[in-house]
Structures are given as C-alpha cells and as structure tokens.
Curated annotation (Swiss-Prot):
GO terms for biological process: mRNA transport; protein transport. FG repeats lie at residues 48-49, 259-260, 412-414. InterPro entries: Nucleotide-bd_a/b_plait_sf. This is Nucleoporin NUP53. Component of the nuclear pore complex (NPC). NPC constitutes the exclusive means of nucleocytoplasmic transport. NPCs allow the passive diffusion of ions and small molecules and the active, nuclear transport receptor-mediated bidirectional transport of macromolecules such as proteins, RNAs, ribonucleoparticles (RNPs), and ribosomal subunits across the nuclear envelope. Due to its 8-fold rotational symmetry, all subunits are present with 8 copies or multiples thereof. Part of a tetrameric NUP192-NUP170-NIC96-NUP53 or NUP188-NUP170-NIC96-NUP53 module. GO terms for cellular component: nuclear membrane; nuclear pore. It is found in: Nucleus, Nuclear pore complex; Nucleus membrane. Residues 84-93, 104-113, 270-283, 291-318 have a biased composition (Polar residues). Contains FG repeats. FG repeats are interaction sites for karyopherins (importins, exportins) and form probably an affinity gradient, guiding the transport proteins unidirectionally with their cargo through the NPC. FG repeat regions are highly flexible and lack ordered secondary structure. The overall conservation of FG repeats regarding exact sequence, spacing, and repeat unit length is limited. FG repeat types and their physico-chemical environment change across the NPC from the nucleoplasmic to the cytoplasmic side.
C-alpha cells in the first residue's frame, strides 16, 4: 500500500528521504498502523497571538556562584556569635526570635535581629509610659480679657493644655465671627480621669490662671521657657503648689514701659507747645493795654502774686514757643523726602499776577491809531449812569460817535441811545 502524503504539516514532521533531503510534505507509511506521529500542542504565545517556534533556543540562566569572601566572613561571624551565645546566661527569648538548633544563622540576619530588639525596647517603654498631668500657674498678663493670648502662646511652645479656655480673642473683636477656628473647640479629646480631676479644680484671677498640661515634660518646657513676652507683658509659668500667687498684678515689660513713658513725654511736650501757641495768641488778641488784674479783685496780694506767676510762666512759654516756632518754620521750609529742596509756597489770591499782554498786543499799544480800537479804549460795554442813561462824562470818543450815529441814523436800533430798550429785549 503506498504511503499517505500530507501537506501543510509542522516542520518537525516533514519527510526526510534516504538521501538526507527534507521534503515539503509528510509521508505516513502503512507500518504506522494508520496513526500519525504524536504531535506536541504549541501554545499561541507572545504579542498579538504570534506562535513561538519550538526550535528557538533560549540562553540558560547561569548558576549563582557564591562569593568565597562573603562566605568566609559569614562563617567567622557566625562562629563568634555562637561562642557569645554559649558564654552568655540562658535567658528567655521571645518566640519570633527562636531558631532551629540545626540551622546556623547568618551575620546579616543576626545584626538585623539585634537592631530590631534594641529599637523596639525603648519604643515599647515609651508607648507604655504613663503621662502625668501637671498643674502650672500663668501669671503677669494684662487682664482677664487677654488671658487667651497667654494660654495660646504657652500651648504652642510647651504642649497641650487640658482646659477648654479660649485660645482666640473675643468674637466681637475678631475679623471673622466664628467659633470653629478656636483650637479649644477644634482639637479637643476625651480627658483621662486624672486630667479631669485637675481640670475641675479651676482657679484664676485678674492677672493669673491655673492650667493643666497633659504631661510633666510639657510643664517642664513651659517653666523652663518662662518668662515670655506676650502683648507687652512678661508672663511667668510656675508650678502650682496648691495656693494662688502672692500678688495678682500685671508685669509689663520694662523696655516697652520705657518706650511708652518716652512717648507720653513727647505727647506732653507737644500739648504744652500747642497750649503756649494758643496762650500767646490770646494775649496778642487782648492787646498790650489789657491788664491781667482787671478781672481779679484787689483785696488780697495772693491774687496779684498769682498774676505775676502766670505772667512769668506765659513769658517762658512764649520764649519756648518762639524757639519752637522758629524750628518749625525752618523744618517747614524744606521738604521731608528731599531735604535740600524748598517747598512751594501758595500766595493769596489777591497777589495773583494778571495775564501779561502778548507780543502783538504790545506792538498794537504803541501805535496811536490802533490803540483807540482796542479793549482799553472801547471797553466791554456801553458807558451808562446809575439811572441807565448814556454817560457823557466817562464815554470815550468812540462811544460818543456811536451814540450820534444811533441817534441820527438809527444804526444800532436805539440800543446805545436808550437803555430801556435793552431791558425790554432781555
């Protein structure tokens, strides 16, 4: 029986003849009992369903070689750790840190385990450490209305204060009328029994208040950083010993107080200078003949002496006012921004200059014939008397000529000759 020829078969099933040449088809001989050779199912892999040829070779992954230097170092450190463990007394080791005795731990794992134990020990101690609320007195601020500033300031630099006192100014003095921005309302948490017991013992005065810090460390920070300058006052933090402070008073900062005193003295001098100016002006208005004793009785000499004292005082003030006025006039003469530039002085309206004539007007004024017809000779209106009649006294030759032309020829309709006609037309 002739063999069966199959086309479109995989490459590994193509027929290879006795001459060693591969044919483009497969041949199935009767000896195979009518069954083809077993085929391996090729999975369609790769991008876009491309098939992977089984003939493609893949580079084998080389075996991982261990560095002999690292292996020797690990052996040395593991032996040293084993000797240390044998010499140390047997202690209870937590279950996660136990290892099987037949396995020798590496140096890196031992170092990591030791570092983890060392770092976890203080963290566990710190986590289980109980915080003790501590009471502190804040004293020295301006008044009870400014208590919020002291509490807010010390809470920021030291730590949380358990009391729910306000940390912001009153609502009426705020720009935004809201209670939600106050930390006393936004960052509150439940109090512990110890904190609640100390918070309930509230004590305060006009210039001091007792507060409770959540821990002794926060109280130590507040006392160590005391005093603090708050709104021009020195606010002290002291441990509460069961009694209020000896003095309930504000403690202003000396530097701020000195600056305020200097400022008040400056304002007093300015008021005195203003009073001297007004006093000198009053005396000048009274005149040189005005007698200061005219309004006083002459029964006693005390009044006269008082008048003399007031007169001498006024003279002294006048002298100081004159000196101050000279300095003020000298200061007002130059600009403040550019001291070398003098200020422009505004003259009164009466001293304003009239507009100067132009060059053409000056030439026309020198010519007699043309000068007759300018505004100075003709004027801006018909010259009339108070009764409305034509004023022959003040009228110039031009207006006299115009009156005759209007009277004889009626050139202007009688407007120049009769003023009543002008009023009727108006």
């Amino acid at each position: 029986m002739p063999p069966l020829i199959l086309h479109n078969v995989p490459d590994d099933e193509l027929y290879v003849g006795d001459d060693g040449i591969q044919r483009p088809f497969a041949m199935v001989f009767p000896q195979q009992d009518g069954s083809l050779r077993s085929r391996k199912a090729n999975l369609e892999t790769g991008a876009f369903g491309k098939s992977t040829r089984r003939t493609r070779s893949k580079a084998a992954t080389p075996a991982k070689r261990e560095d002999p230097t690292i292996a020797a170092a690990d052996k040395i450190f593991s032996n040293w750790l084993a000797s240390q463990n044998q010499s140390a007394p047997q202690t209870s080791v937590p279950a996660p840190a136990q290892r099987k005795p037949n396995l020798i731990p590496s140096s890196s794992s031992q170092n990591l385990a030791q570092g983890h134990d060392e770092s976890s020990a203080p963290s566990q101690t710190r986590f289980f450490r109980k915080q003790e609320p501590t009471e502190v007195i804040l004293r020295g601020y301006r008044n009870a209305q400014h208590q919020y500033a002291a509490i807010n300031h010390y809470e920021q630099i030291a730590g949380r204060i358990c009391e729910d006192y306000p940390r912001e100014p009153p609502v009426e003095s705020r720009r935004y009328k809201s209670e939600l921005r106050d930390p006393a309302f936004t960052h509150r948490r439940a109090l512990t029994p110890e904190e609640r017991a100390k918070v309930n013992r509230a004590m305060s005065g006009e210039h001091w208040v007792k507060v409770t810090f959540e821990s002794a460390e926060a109280a130590d920070k507040a006392v160590y950083s005391s005093p603090q300058l708050i709104q021009g006052h020195l606010v002290y933090a002291e441990y509460y010993k069961g009694v209020p402070p000896a003095q309930d008073e504000a403690i202003p900062d000396p530097s701020v107080a000195a600056f305020g005193a200097a400022l008040s003295r400056t304002q007093t001098l300015r008021q005195r200078n203003r009073g001297s100016f007004s006093l000198s002006g009053t005396q000048e208005a009274g005149g040189p003949d005005a007698s200061p004793t005219s309004s006083l009785t002459a029964d006693t000499g005390t009044l006269a002496s008082g008048v003399e004292i007031s007169t001498s005082t006024s003279n002294t003030l006048n002298g100081g006012a004159a000196a101050g006025g000279a300095e003020k006039s000298q200061d007002d003469e130059f600009c403040r921004v550019i001291p070398t530039v003098r200020k422009a002085k505004l003259l009164p309206m009466e001293e304003a200059l009239l507009p100067a004539p132009t060059f053409t007007q000056r030439i026309a004024n020198h010519i007699p014939f043309l000068r007759w017809f300018n505004g100075a000779m003709i004027g801006s209106e018909v010259p009339r008397t108070e009764t409305g009649e034509f004023d022959w006294v003040r009228a110039s030759l031009f207006w006299k000529l115009m009156w005759w032309l209007d009277f004889l020829l009626g050139l202007f309709g009688g407007d120049i000759r009769d003023a009543e006609k002008d009023d009727k037309e108006d």
